[in-house]
Amino acid sequence: MLQQTTFSAVLTRFHPFLDRFPDVSALAAASEDEVLAAWSGLGYYARARNLRRAAIEIVARYGGEIPREVRLLRRLPGFGDYMAAAVASLAFGLRVPAVEANVERVLSRVFALRGVPGSRALREDVTSRARRLLPSRRAGNVTAALMDLGQLICTPRRPICPTCPLADDCAARRRGDPETFPGRRPRPSPVSVSLAAAIARKEGRFLLVRRRSTWLRGMWEFPSAEADSPEKARRALARRLRPLELEFRSPRPIARARHTVVNRRIEIAVFLAEPVGSNGLRRPDARWFRPGELANAAIPTLTRKIADAAARSG
C-alpha cells in the first residue's frame, strides 16, 4: 500500500483491509471486486489486483505459506526486485537490501551520490552500498530504520539534520547542501483533459459501468468520455450513452469539478442522463447500483468526486 501512496492515506485503509482479509487464504478466496473495493481511494489499483493474484498463487503452489526465498518471491505476480527484497528483509529478516525512495535518498546523502531518483544506475549503486551495511542478523530492522529515517527525518525538502542519527557520517551534510542529493526527477509536463460524465437514475438506482482501459481497469464509474475540449468530451459521451440506452436529460451540465492524477489535470462536466424506454440493460460491464451499495463498491476517487459534485448541485 505504501508504494507511491502517502502514509496518511494508507493509515485509513490498512487495518480495515486486514480485518476484511486477515490472511493469504482469505485474500485468495475474495473476488477482484471485493479487493478493489477495499483498496478504493488508494489509487494504483494494479497493486490490488496483483496482490490478489499473488495470494492465489501462494495458496495454490505453496499451501498458503509465503515463500522465504527471494528467487521464489520474484516469481509471484506483481513482485519485482524491490517487493521480493522487502518481504524477504522486513518479514523474514534476511540479509537482502530493499531499496525504495526513502532508503535511496538517505544513502545517497550519506555517500553524496548524484543521480536521477529512481533511475536504474542510482538504484543499483545504492543497493550495492546497502548490502554492505546490513548485518548478518535482524537485517530487517536496519531496512525498516532506513525507511523510517527517510520518511520522518531525511525528507526530500528541509531534512532535519540536527536530529539525524547518521548526521556525523553524512557526506552531503558535510558539504552543506544535503537537500540537493541525489538530484531532481524530471517532472512530466501537465496534460489538460476534459471529461464529461453522466449520472443516470432509475427507480432509485444509479447506472455504473466497468472500466476496461489500463487506468482504473475493473473499477466501476459513471459513464464518461475524455477529449481535449469540453464540447468534444460531451459529444463523445453522447455516443457512449446510446448502447447503454441512455440520453441526456439536458445538454447543459449540472455541475463541474476538477481532479488531478499525476500530471493529468481533469476538468469534469457532470450531466444528467435518463433511460430510453424500459432500459432493461443486460450486459456484464454495466449495472444499476442502489445508493447503499455504492459505499462498498469498487469505485475510484474520481467517481466519488463526480457524485459529490452532483449532490452539491441539488
Can you say where each PLM-predicted feature lies in the sequence?
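Intrinsically disordered, low-complexity, charged terminal extensions of DNA damage-control enzymes
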Residues: 151-314
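Catalytic cores of DNA base-excision repair glycosylases
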Residues: 2-175, 179, 192, 242-247
